[in-house]
Amino acid sequence: MTNVAIIQFPGSNTERETFMACHRVGLNPVEFLWNHPVDKLSDFDGYIIVGGFSYEDRSRAGVIAALDPILDQIKIESELGKPVLGICNGAQILVESGLVPGLNKYKIGLALTDNKRIREGQVVGVGYYNTWANLQMTAEPNSCAFTRHIKKGASFNIPLAHGEGRFVAPELLLEEIIANEQTIFRYCNDDGLIIDEFPTNPNGSIFNLAAVCNTSGNVMAMMPHPERSKNGDLIFSSMLEFIELGNPINNNSLNFDTPLIDIDNYNKNDNVEWIVEMIINDNEAVSVQNALIQKGHDVIISRHTHWEIDIDQKKSVTLSKIDKSGELYNSNKEFISKVKVARNTASYLVRQHDDIFGRAKLESLKDKFEIKEISNIKHGVIWNITVNSGNFDSTLNTILDTNILFNPLSYECYRIR
């Protein structure tokens, strides 16, 4: 019997469909929760990390789960050649953990960030999106554990449902993973044509990427949901064959060298700055704090929402209109505050490169609320780290190396103090 661990975190929600898909092809799925003893993972022949919203996508999708001790053991098992499939949120976890694409020492090489639906050069939609998507197999069948029963060039139609499914990759790394045939599935239209715009590309992924595997071919991060349709069964039957053949991995490698994280000091300009603090408990900050404590850091984490507002004229009147709109903060549970100076505390401003959320708020304020005096809005998050014990600077550097606060491929970061 081929036993596959179905790995679930708090917030996972597609385990039933995954169990059904495994049963259809002869795999024996076994529930494995995040709080089970990690050493028991070695008893399994393969692993599937299911979709959903692990830890409510706090900080960003997949990153809290990626720091869980389970992933350390999954890395060990994957190095033995065992297959690991991450679906949707599972794909985000594999990317945030560095298991995909497989850089040296599990360095982060990819990002899965907010959807951006583009047609004729214009952004026509952002955020969560669900549909049925066409996927084309663009690698040789034996290049990946999950494609052995699929012909190169074949396409199939399966469901897709996510808010952060847009693959981002450095150009040089993308060239390498293409050459290695790690770009397993790409979005195509009904005729099998790969067109880099919506609706063929449903989320703006670079190179129309829907799934990417690691260098050995035994770990795959896939955003659409093959478990939700029989159309995806060949992925699971391929996994079974791969295990039965003794895990025949590939010997590819990646030479891409991840650049060092460059964090500049934040220089405040003349624009209006709103720093929003929560009245109630900030569960997102608590989750990040707990994850760091689990990693051995004696820290306190707090968080503020940061808005930078560029106003053309009538500044005080315009700010009053923005305030009354309720678009930038909810006065029932938030208030405008400031970054507090505290001992052994560092603050970092994190922003998405594309700042999709800031642009959406700008459009809403101008179009819905007819506040035309705003020329630009930038959205960010301020993370405050208080180090209770240990060396202050080395603790900060170690925390930044976890990427828990931001993925450097899709975010920019500034040191406030």
Label for each model-derived stretch:
Residues 1-101, 120-125, 129, 200, ...:
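N-terminal beta1-alpha1 cap of cysteine-dependent amidohydrolase-like domains
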Residues 20-24, 174-176, 227, 237-238, ...:
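Short, solvent-exposed amphipathic alpha-helical segments in soluble enzyme
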Residues 101-112:
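A short alpha->loop->secondary-structure connector
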Residues 246-417:
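Core nucleic-acid recognition elements
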